[in-house]
Amino acid sequence: MGKPTLLEPGHLYNVPAEHKNDIPIHYIITWIKQRLPEFGGAIPTSLADRVLIIKSRTGSGKSTALPVHVFRILRNENTHSFQKYLGRSVICTQPRVLTAVTLAKDIGASTHYPDMILGQTVGYQTKPLTEKPNRGLIYATAGVLLAQLHTMTDDEIASRYAFMIIDEAHERALGIDLMLMYIKSMLERMLQRGSIGALRIPFVILTSATIDTHKYSTYFGIGKENIILVEGRQFGVETHWPLYNTNNYIKTACETALTIHKENIHDRPTEADILIFMPGMGEIRFLSTLLNNANMDLAKEKLPLMLILPIDSEAIAQENEAYLGLKAEIKNLWVKNPLTAKVEKPLRRVIVSTVVAETGLTIETLKYVIDPGWNRSVETYYPEWAGGLITRPAAQSRIEQRKGRVGRVFPGHFYPLYTKHVFEQIPAQQYPEIITEGPGAIFLNIVVETIKKNKEGVFKAEEIDMLDPPPTDALASAIERAIVGGLLTRGEKGLQLTQLGDIASRFSFLSIEEARMCFSGYFWQAAISDIAIILAVVSVVDKKLTNLLDSKQRNGAMLAEAVLAGIPPFLQHIDNAYTNIHLLLADDLLEGLFIFEGFQHAIVYFINNKVNNLAKHLREWCEKKMLKYSSMVQILARREDILNELAIVGLNPFHQWQNRLASANAETFLKRVCTLKQCIYEAYRLNCFCYDEHRLLYTGRNGIHFSYHDTVIKNPSCIVTPRIMLAPVSKQYMEWRLEPSFVSVLDGFVNMDINFLLPRQEIPNILGGVEDEEEEEPPLPIQVFLHNYVKTHFHFSGKSFKELKMKPSQMIKFPETTLINMIPDIPKNVVQTYLEINVCHQYSFKRLIYCETFYTNMDDVQHENAVELIGLPMAAHHLTINDFNKLYRVLKPDGFLIVYDLHNSQEAYWLHSLQDALGHHTIRRDMDFHTITEWETIFKECGFSPIFSKQPSEHELFIVFKK
């Protein structure tokens, strides 16, 4: 086995010429020591003294040799291993559990590092698995360090860690981007404290094989001298490009693996394994079935067999048979002959894996990689806030990582299932999750960190200091949800956290909606344990409740049995129990609550009976109920996380324990159902949808619609769902439809705030007539302001507003409640909120009037603020005559009035309201006005002069009057 290139001379580049032939690790350690005061270096004064970027190709030892040698800076290499290390630690973050655990175990078992002993000087810390020393080299998932940065002070972090190594820094998960934001802010704060803070400031090292060095160095404000480039593997990797693309990559992957196996039948078992990447577990199962069938053919031909190992995050967490087979030596493994049923030694392992095997994992027997070139990740689309798992071509950087799994200890082979031309067309880097998903659960963390840097203590969007800020539409949607959830409010100087927002910002892993539901639980006196279970079900279960069932033949009967296992005793003996409970609850989330309650009953039963191997009995119970054991365990863990989060911030996680829904009786059951539904509604009320009897669809305020059918509950008038999912229409074509994830029926359970059902529309081109692509769009005053403001303050990932080539009305698509709130310091003389007036019938979008000052209600309208009104089409609900009186009373002296698309039956209502408001001439209600002249005549009698008018068609007109 060759040494990692970090330990061999002559692999450095982008360094001074006299150091080209240095051993890379020696050069790196010397570079670091020169900047440490304890080794004679100066006290750090800038980030350049504490941030180093190492772009080191796969196979160089950046995940193994580098952390060990950095740790040896702190612990003398010659120190006896039995002497306990008491200094500060080195933390090396990994994007996945598998790599963190594997690297720590491999280093602890390696003869190359006798001073690194697992549990004493090296260890791992992940959410599900931990074995680490109090001080030493700690491999951890990024989430572990993120949680510490979120909850600990700068000094606490500095006293714990001397070095932070962010391995695979090119990964752009939300947590990693937030972690880098935290780290940068911490370093800046400690540097601002002068020598007192700078002496113990941690050293940060970013490592990756495919990192964009320019982007990261610019973000941290460091120069080229802080970037070290190291060559990678010593052994070549041959790429076998196909002549044609495939239209069935699973079948082609199987055929390719079988061809490799047959053509290389004389491979040594220690240099023979195949790794195949698949985008998801469904594809892994399908491919594993095909490969096992191929083993049957091999057995018939009396050829050596393959051992098929399906690997994903679940297999790693459970350390199942496949994972143990991955970690074992090939000589100790056996495979069953499908013909003779006898066991025999396999020639090679075929590892079928998701992206968990993409980075930081070394399989020393791996010789071949087969890559279909796909990647599956969550994408969310705003402002509709609809998302789902989308399968797209993997970026070139990810493909290089996959290719880098081979060629580490002997030459390897890479088999892409796409042509070289296709590879050259796909993006070089993956899109960051903050772009594809939006800020999501980390939004409040971003707000808090941004507020810390603002002298006035307010949140300003343009001050977000991240590698890539959230997209404007995603940011606007997040602000809206935070305001509606009561976590953000507008102060005199900008957006500020409310008291609830301050509490919510202390949560490490709770989203806006999760925090709001917990707060609502305390307000409505709900059992917080029930709230935690509901949120855990939403977090773990994908799309619908039947996905909890561990069976290909999922059906209502299986789901019914699982639900009935957890219902209150008084309901267990009624006829048609599930049907009646389904009618009674009208709620997928509450049914999920009962499914988990049944699982909890089983836990209590087995514990009370003192069974041996509790996990085995629970797994058997889940198999009997057709439930996924792994999902139930994840719900249990997530529920505990939520309850712990509440306890950490000082809230009682056992609040109203005695009022749990599962313990209700006939008298209290419906009351508790209503209470929980109220909490669900308050958390997700922006996702309310009403049934449109004419279109036979559910429509919401976002302008989106979907169909929803329940076999028992027929077309409820109003439902709420935690999220809108993108569901594939067919496997053959990349087409998607919208569908709710879980449904909670509100009819008769919750008194809704109807204002949250107002649809949102794009700002139209009112004054410009029909849009002509050849002509510049005449912008509205509000658009002019936003155009100039956005052009000045938002950069859109490096592109100016002009470069985007978007017209204002195309650009500004924000909901009415956030169009202005997203811009924290908007001048007072610019429009800041809206007052809705309904002048339309059921199916038309008519108008929205907004004023120049933020009003909490109509009573706050003052004359001097109502200088100008501009009409926009927007559906709204009826205001009362008193509301009209208040509005037009302040308009009478010098205001504008707009008539837009008013005709037929609605004119009587409008004119009657206007008559009462203005107190002018009697207006005949039976008059039908269809022309500009007719409208001008009647409003002239009321003291208004037309200053602009247009009538595109018989039933469309637009008039601006001035008092």
Swiss-Prot record:
Record: residues binding ATP: S56, R57, T58, G59, S60, G61, K62, S63
Subcellular location field: Host membrane; Virion
Root EC class: hydrolase
Induction section of the entry: Expressed in the late phase of the viral replicative cycle.
Gene Ontology molecular function terms on file: ATP binding; ATP hydrolysis activity; RNA binding; RNA helicase activity
Enzymatic reactions: ATP + H2O = ADP + phosphate + H(+)
Motif range (DEAH box): 167-170
EC code: 3.6.4.13
Helicase C-terminal domain residues: 253-459
Xref: Pfam families: DEAD (PF00270)
Keywords: ATP-binding, Helicase, Host membrane, Hydrolase, Membrane, Nucleotide-binding, Transmembrane, Transmembrane helix, Virion
One GO CC term, this protein: virion component
Protein name in UniProt: Putative RNA Helicase B962L
Lineage of the species this protein comes from: Viruses, Varidnaviria, Bamfordvirae, Nucleocytoviricota, Pokkesviricetes
